[in-house]
Amino acid sequence: MSSQLEQLKAYTTVVADTGDFKQIAAFAPRDATTNPSLILKAVSQPAYAPLLAQTAAAHRGQPLDAIVDRVLVRFGCEILNVVPGRVSTEVDARLSFDAAATVARAQRIMALYESEGIARERVLIKIAATWEGIQAAKALEHHGIHCNLTLLFAFCQAVACGESGVRLISPFVGRIHDWHKKAAGARWDEAANAGANDPGVKSVAQIWRYFRKFGIETEVMGASFRNTGQILALAGCDLLTISPELLAQLQASEATVMRALDVDAALHCDAKALSFNEASFRYALNEDAMATEKLAEGIRAFAVDAAQLDRLIQAL
């Protein structure tokens, strides 16, 4: 019997969610994703400290943000030596409400990849799914730079990304789960909210069905998993990005994996087509307390880790 990881790959593209490129090969994912927190975690390990030091030294005298981008691209290139597909590299979260600055930073990151001989099709630029981030991604896609819209918690964020022609979105399963669990407090029933009933799983499944029903080409990549049950409940999703710890658990199990998301069922679901302009997007996001809180919290956390990476580089 093959492992759950190999069975899952029959239904879904498996992506490694880590900056630790030495770990990736064991799981043979197609793609990999990084974010400021994962890069910070990697460079804090002795095995990766020389990579940070060498990159910073080679570009000493350049502006700090330019050196940071060099570090991100260095990690991305190392990852692309291991995976056959794409790597996602994130724009500084402190630019999440500045569309023009996000576009400029994304263009610079892509230019650095191209200077290393990496084709555009192998890179996704990660951007927080704020209104400004979505507009930046729309402009970038128009110029052939593909984007991965992250920190996605609300249905309106997903629909707006699809309308804007974004290549890929990353709805966050685990963080949605966390919010609902905390909000319920003592009333939370873990068993009743597991698998297909998990609020994070339900959110991704709703987005995936909507995109299939209306022929939206944006790829849906479930992210931020807390356990393998959440992952298996989304078998059939376009892509799932999974931490090395959970990849190892899937690799160690030979229990049967079944397709959970069905295209035919999606095509016949009762979803109604929606469209958002800036005003209706902001109102819909504001009406979703979970998404509003988690988006803000996520941007703050990534900004803190980006600032910490800045300090590490400045200290070299």
UniProtKB/Swiss-Prot annotation:
Q: What GO cellular-component annotations does this UniProt entry give?
A: cytoplasm
Tell me yes or no: is Transport among this UniProt entry's keywords. no
Q: What class of enzyme is it?
A: transferase
**One Pfam family, short name please?**
TAL_FSA
Q: What does this protein do?
A: Transaldolase is important for the balance of metabolites in the pentose-phosphate pathway.
NCBIfam families membership: talAB (TIGR00874)
User: In its UniProt entry, what is this protein called?
Assistant: Transaldolase
Q: Which source organism?
A: Methylibium petroleiphilum (strain ATCC BAA-1232 / LMG 22953 / PM1)
Q: Which gene encodes it?
A: tal
